UniProtKB/Swiss-Prot annotation:
One of its GO terms (molecular function) is structural constituent of ribosome. Gene3D superfamilies: 1.10.287.1480. Part of the 30S ribosomal subunit. Contacts proteins S3 and S10. It holds the Pfam family Ribosomal_S14. Belongs to the universal ribosomal protein uS14 family. Binds 16S rRNA, required for the assembly of 30S particles and may also be responsible for determining the conformation of the 16S rRNA at the A site. This is Small ribosomal subunit protein uS14. HAMAP family: Ribosomal_uS14_1 (MF_00537). It comes from Acinetobacter baumannii (strain AB0057). Keywords: Ribonucleoprotein, Ribosomal protein, RNA-binding, rRNA-binding.
């Protein structure tokens, strides 16, 4: 299981990303707007750089909902491969069966 601090850090990042999402989108649109003046675009670029580092969605990491494990994550289920296997074998995930061919 991942450390509680790592899980909490990731949750804090998610909140920060959500908080600044609209402002980031607005600044990025201004930067990409070719009709805006160079001064406006440069000013928007500086404001974007001044935002918190954790406000960028790139810094988010998918983690298992049960253990917090960062690797082997299945987006469809929100679980790591280990816990997904356990829950499927117990029959907790409907419609998923072991492969046999």
């Amino acid at each position: 299981m991942a450390k509680k601090g790592m899980i909490n850090r990731e949750l804090k990042r998610e909140k920060t990303v959500a908080k600044y999402a609209a402002k980031r989108a607005e600044l990025k649109a201004t930067i990409a707007n070719v009709n805006a003046s160079d001064e406006e675009r440069f000013e928007a670029m500086l404001k974007l750089q001044a935002l918190p580092r954790n406000a960028s969605p790139v810094r988010l990491r998918n983690r298992c909902g049960l253990t917090g494990r960062p690797h082997g994550y299945f987006r469809k289920f929100g679980l790591s491969r280990n816990k997904l296997r356990d829950t499927v074998m117990q029959g907790d995930v409907p419609g998923v069966v072991k492969a046999s061919w």
